[in-house]
A protein has these predicted regions:
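A conserved mid-protein helix/loop that constitutes part of the nucleotide-sugar donor-binding site
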Residues: 17-22, 166-185, 200-203
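Aromatic "clamp/platform" in nucleotide-sugar-dependent glycosyltransferases that forms part
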Residues: 220, 239
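Membrane-proximal helix-turn-helix segments that form the acceptor-binding/catalytic region
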Residues: 99-117
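A charged, aromatic-enriched C-terminal amphipathic alpha-helix characteristic of glycosyltransferases
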Residues: 15, 293-334
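Acidic anion/phosphate-binding donor-loop and adjacent secondary structure
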Residues: 129-130, 140-162, 231
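Conserved acidic donor-binding segment of nucleotide-sugar-dependent glycosyltransferases
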Residues: 259, 271-282, 286-295
């Protein structure tokens, strides 16, 4: 059986760690390969088992980490290596990159060390391809997934939208500051907004919400199913979002997601999720006003199996490619 070493340098509870748990525990994937999760030091990815048949990087890409990536490639010249890009996207680059040339040089240099690069959404893959950051013939798209079966048992929301949930890490990326400002402009006393999550922006968000009793902070959702069950609508005003796992979870739970028009969220709009076209307080206030009071139920509720199958099929296809062609130990040309 194939032995796959998934390297991770951040074990903070979140989407990536839950995704790796899914890969490690899924029985169908387990029939093809033994997926092992290896925690490594930031910028120093060592300790890969000598008998690993394939190495998969879920590591942060940075200039500080590039020498470690080069060393990893040098130590495993005959082993196929894959990088999964969880962090960077077009939306991220637009808001956080001051030197486009330098940033793109970093990505090209890093990705060239790997036999395959996995994007987590079609939108992210399109950005990588358009900018020549990864060779198209080495680029795959595999959406991340977690176990969604518990969400299928949640009853669909009945009646109009009244209880809105914002689920995720409390930081600038998620756009929750803009959401609070927009929500406070909606003059509906029966509408509530509950945040599920923790993060560095908590104090800032509490200050923005002060004086509006409709806005609540519930902390980290130990039981995500309960958070979805207690809501009529989920909102994702993200400034950038390579994929957006919360949208998949909400849809399986029968909830629509009001979302930003960025990155991987665009891939999930066809499931019946309305998009807010502009990243402004005014646009979000208008969207919230229009959706409040409307029927809450998602018209076409996806199954956990359908979303799970897309991820598993992607990995099966990727492993077939890697095991049926010689590993390319030499660097790709950018």
């Amino acid at each position: 059986m194939l032995k796959i070493a998934h390297l991770i340098d951040d074990t903070t509870a979140g989407g990536v760690t839950r995704y790796l748990d899914f890969l490690r525990q899924d029985p169908r994937l387990g029939r093809q390969a033994d997926h092992q999760v290896i925690e490594v030091k930031r910028n120093r990815p060592g300790g890969v088992p000598a008998d690993a048949d394939i190495i998969v990087s879920h590591l942060a890409v940075s200039w500080a980490g590039l020498p470690g990536m080069i060393a990893l490639r040098a130590r495993h010249t005959g082993t196929p290596m894959v990088h999964v890009e969880h962090s960077y996207s077009e939306g991220f680059a637009a808001l956080n990159v001051t030197s486009r040339t330098r940033f793109q040089c970093l990505l090209r240099s890093t990705y060239s060390l790997f036999d395959r690069v996995v994007a987590v959404s079609d939108a992210q893959a399109g950005w990588l391809a358009r900018n020549g950051l990864a060779r198209v013939d080495t680029l795959d798209v595999i959406p991340p997934m977690v176990d969604l079966t518990a969400l299928e048992d949640i009853a669909a929301p009945e009646g109009p939208v009244r209880k809105i949930a914002a689920i995720g890490r409390l930081d600038r990326q998620k756009g929750f500051d803009m959401l609070i400002r927009a929500f406070r402009l909606v003059e509906d006393p029966d509408l509530t907004l509950t945040f599920f999550g923790e993060g560095d922006a908590r104090d800032e968000l509490l200050a923005l919400a002060e004086g509006d009793s409709r806005i609540r902070f519930a902390g980290f959702a130990v039981n995500p199913a309960a958070a979805y069950a207690g809501s009529d609508l989920v909102v994702m005003p993200s400034r950038w979002e390579p994929y957006g796992l919360v949208a998949a979870e909400a849809n399986v739970a029968g909830r629509r997601v009001l979302m930003s028009c960025v990155d991987g969220l665009q891939d999930q709009a066809p499931r019946g999720n309305p998009i807010v076209g502009e990243p402004t307080v005014a646009a979000w206030a208008d969207a919230l006003t229009r959706i409040a009071g409307r029927p809450a139920a998602l018209a076409q509720r996806p199954t956990a199996a359908s979303l799970r199958n897309e991820t598993i099929t992607g990995w099966e296809r990727l492993l077939d490619v890697l095991t049926n062609q010689p590993a390319e130990a030499t660097a790709q040309t950018a």
